[in-house]
Design a protein with these regions (language model features):
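N-terminal secretory/targeting leader peptides
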Residues: 2-7, 13-22, 30-121, 129-331
Length: 331
């Protein structure tokens, strides 16, 4: 994205939000407005969580803190939203952990392939001093702090062109990935052709054959309706994604102690409920997709793991910091 285009998008976001704020001002002149944006569809559990957090905070503060939610990429791509939160054009964003690696490289390890043993392992590490340390670096570098971590799910590959049983079947496969270097390295280790695309462009790209497939957790495949344009679900389970909730530091500073406690408490309550909903959906959706006509493939997972673990951790150790992989793995 060129610098001029990025400023054009940012200006457009700012103008739209300024208009919304001006319109609302007569009703809530004294309220602190926090705009929370996400690329996820309105029916995704993470967006349901956003709405519940907004309501609880509004109720507990008597309307003094008004969280406005903007799902479904209304305000831009993942990168756009993080940059807008950093600048203060919006105040809260939730995104996959590795997306923050563009500012603090250590964040990308949190979506490293085959790092997490399960959701519980991820939760233990992501509520540890590791996250506090990364958050402090994010505040210093880009004026954002992490105020919540949720479970986004275990990621699997889907294909619109062929069944994938072993990693050899990925050779030349056009795999959509987020704009994240660790995802690119993983796809390359598989022999695939990594193709970065914004999430909002993915459904159309799959339907038109611009890419052969993608990878995401089951609830995202469901909520974004990727099952409509993909024939095969391949249970690779290659990455467990923690989704980070970040707030602009100036916005955080504008809240008093009780308001901060209300926001954190609501995030803890509804974040846990969201995690449980994601886990429940993961337990049912394979059968749902199968009943809907998708072919479900249980691949040779070790053939996917081996080339990735042989190359990716060593490639990124200097970026992450020596010993960080082992420190996280020990939780």
């Amino acid at each position: 994205m060129s610098e001029s285009r990025r400023w054009t998008r940012r200006d457009a976001i700012g103008a739209a939000l300024a208009g919304a704020a001006f319109t609302a001002m007569p009703l809530r002149a004294a309220a602190t407005t926090l705009r929370w944006a996400s690329v996820l569809p309105a029916n995704h559990p993470a967006v349901v969580m956003m709405e519940r957090v907004a309501k609880q905070v509004r109720d507990e503060t008597g309307g003094a803190v008004d969280i406005q939610t903007f799902p479904a990429g209304q305000l831009g791509s993942s990168r756009d939203l993080i940059e807008a939160t950093s600048s203060g054009a919006i105040q809260i964003v939730d995104e996959g952990a590795a997306q923050f690696g563009q500012f603090v490289p250590q964040f990308s390890i949190l979506e490293a392939p085959y790092l997490w043993r399960d959701a519980q392992h991820m939760r233990r590490a992501c509520t540890s001093p590791v996250i506090d340390e990364m958050s402090a670096m994010l505040v210093a570098k880009r004026q954002m702090r992490i105020i919540g971590v949720t479970y986004y799910g275990n990621r699997h590959v889907t294909s619109g062109t062929k069944a994938i049983n072993r990693v050899d079947d990925m050779k030349g496969f056009k795999l959509r990935i987020p704009e994240v270097d660790t995802f690119r390295a993983m796809a390359e280790a598989w022999g695939a052709r990594p193709t970065p695309l914004n999430f909002g462009e993915l459904y159309l790209a799959l339907s038109q054959g611009v890419v052969d497939g993608q990878e995401n957790p089951l609830p995202t495949i469901q909520s974004a309706k990727f099952f409509e344009v993909q024939k095969y679900l391949v249970l690779t389970g290659h990455i467990i994604t923690p989704r980070l909730i970040a707030i602009n530091e100036g916005a955080w500073a504008s809240l008093d102690a009780k308001q901060r406690a209300s926001l954190k408490g609501a995030l803890d309550t509804h974040g846990l409920a969201q995690d449980n909903e994601i886990l429940a959906q993961e337990g049912k959706l394979v059968d749902t997709f199968k009943a809907g006509g998708m072919t479900v493939v249980t691949p040779d997972v070790e053939s996917f793991r081996k080339p990735v673990l042989a190359s990716v951790p060593a490639k990124f150790e200097a970026k992450w910091g020596k010993g960080l992989w082992e420190r996280i793995a020990a939780y």
